[in-house]
Curated annotation (Swiss-Prot):
Necessary cofactors: a divalent metal cation
Designated name of the protein: FAD synthase
Gene Ontology terms describing biological process: FAD biosynthetic process; FMN metabolic process
Gene: ribL
A Pfam family hit: CTP_transf_like
Organism encoding this protein: Methanococcoides burtonii (strain DSM 6242 / NBRC 107633 / OCM 468 / ACE-M)
Length: 143
């Protein structure tokens, strides 16, 4: 049984997220998903949707066997419970695959790291594009 782990913020769910999770699932038999904690997101703007709500939405996907919130202190902590065989990164995730595999090995994990370079091509397959569209349509100062 091959256990796959996918991670992400999953803010403003869109078809690109669905594509990523389906691709991740194709690497194994079980798909676990770590949803980033609001407090750990430092490389981009804070999510619009709170972490608990994002977790519930990801948990509802049929391709996902189990979704969990990430750790608020150590990104490797949840891996002790999950013990993945493969960690799948999306095309836009900032981790370096080689560096991540090295860090995993130093912590006793044997997971292989793969990146899905394909991205679904559609007009609103990006949380950033969705936000831009909302701002264009409704203006920045309106509620």
């Amino acid at each position: 049984m091959t256990r796959v782990l996918a991670t992400g913020t999953f803010d403003l769910l869109h078809p690109g997220h669905v594509f990523f999770l389906r691709q991740a699932r194709s690497f194994g038999d079980e798909l676990y998903v770590l949803v980033a904690r609001d407090s750990m997101i430092k490389h981009k703007a804070q999510p619009i949707v709170p972490e608990g709500q994002r977790l519930k939405m990801i948990s509802a996907f049929g391709v996902v066997d189990k979704a969990l919130l990430g750790s608020e202190s150590d990104i490797f902590e949840p891996l002790k419970e999950i013990n993945p065989d493969i960690i799948v990164l999306g095309h836009d995730q900032f981790f370096d695959t080689g560096e991540l595999e090295k860090n995993l090995g130093e912590r006793g994990f044997k997971a292989k790291v793969v990146r899905i370079d394909d991205a679904m091509k559609c007009e609103l397959c990006s949380s950033g594009r969705i936000i831009k569209r909302v701002l264009e349509r409704y203006g920045q100062n309106e509620e």
